[in-house]
Each structure stands twice: as structure tokens, then as C-alpha cells.
A protein has these predicted regions:
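Short aromatic/basic micro-patch
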Residues: 43, 94, 121
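Short, solvent-exposed loop/turn segments that connect beta-strands within catalytic domains
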Residues: 24-30, 89-92
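Acidic, metal-coordinating catalytic segment for phosphate/diphosphate chemistry
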Residues: 1-24
């Protein structure tokens, strides 16, 4: 994918997401997922573009607000995945999210959406099984921090 850019190049139905990850002492990768507030399904932290922020910066802000994640997202996305919006919006409307890897360094005790979502670590395989979107499953399965 090409270099980072401001959100002017994104479509109105494009969001940014963070693939929050950590490496266990065993060398195994774990992926952090949160539940959607509307449906309770497992998703990565994601949200809308933020004026004046680069896409990876906005993804990191969303991860902090939704899961209390502290860390810096990589400037290059891993790719993008398509999904259908939650029923409270327009269930038939397709959107896409560019997803940026973010190595988790810690967690804040207080954050905007604390208590509104479940936040849980999964093995890479389990995370790919828990998400619904085929493109996101592929991105999670293929993720290798050595490629960053």
C-alpha cells in the first residue's frame, strides 16, 4: 500500500481500525478484540477519520478510547476489509476499514468507553475465528510482526 495520507483521500464510508497485538513470552502472538456496542460481536477497535490526524494516528486514538490501549500504530496499513454497518445505521450499507498494526505497550486505567465493551486477548487463530468479516480473518491470519 502507498504511504500514509490525511483523510481527504478516504471515502465517506471508510473507517480506520487498529490490529492491537502483543507477543507472549512463548513467542506466540495475541490479538486484542473488543465487542461492538450494538451487536456484541468481536471486532478490532475502529472509528471514523479525525480531522488533522493521519490514518494510523486516528486508529491509535480509537484503540485508546475504546479499549484503553496504549501504543503507537504503524504508519502503513496491513490492508483493508469490507463489512456491513451495524443495524442502528444501515445494515445493507457496505463500509471498509483500513487496519493498522499497533503493538500494545500498556493499558490506561481510565478511558472514554470503559465498561461499554468487553476487551479480550485471543490467540491469532482464535481472533481470526471470532471476527465475522472474511477480509479481516485473512489479515489476522497473515499478520506477522516480523514483516513490519
Amino acid at each position: 500500500m502507498s504511504g500514509s495520507k490525511d483523510y481527504d483521500g478516504f471515502g465517506k464510508d471508510t473507517q480506520v481500525a487498529a490490529l492491537c497485538w502483543r507477543l507472549r513470552k512463548t513467542g506466540k502472538i495475541q490479538i486484542l478484540l473488543i465487542t461492538s456496542r450494538n451487536t456484541g460481536r468481536w471486532i478490532p477497535p475502529k472509528g471514523w477519520p479525525i480531522d488533522g490526524k493521519k490514518p494510523h494516528e486516528a486508529a491509535a486514538i480509537e484503540a485508546f478510547e475504546e479499549a484503553g490501549v496504549e501504543g503507537k500504530a504503524a504508519a502503513e496499513p496491513l490492508g483493508f476489509y469490507k463489512y456491513f454497518r451495524d443495524p442502528d445505521y444501515d445494515f445493507k450499507r457496505s463500509s471498509e476499514a483500513f487496519i493498522y498494526p499497533l503493538r500494545v505497550k500498556g493499558f490506561a486505567k481510565s478511558f472514554k468507553e470503559r465498561g461499554e465493551r468487553k476487551v479480550r486477548w485471543f490467540s491469532q487463530k482464535q481472533a481470526a475465528q471470532r471476527v465475522r468479516e472474511a477480509g479481516l480473518k485473512r489479515i489476522i491470519r497473515a499478520f506477522d510482526p516480523d514483516d513490519l
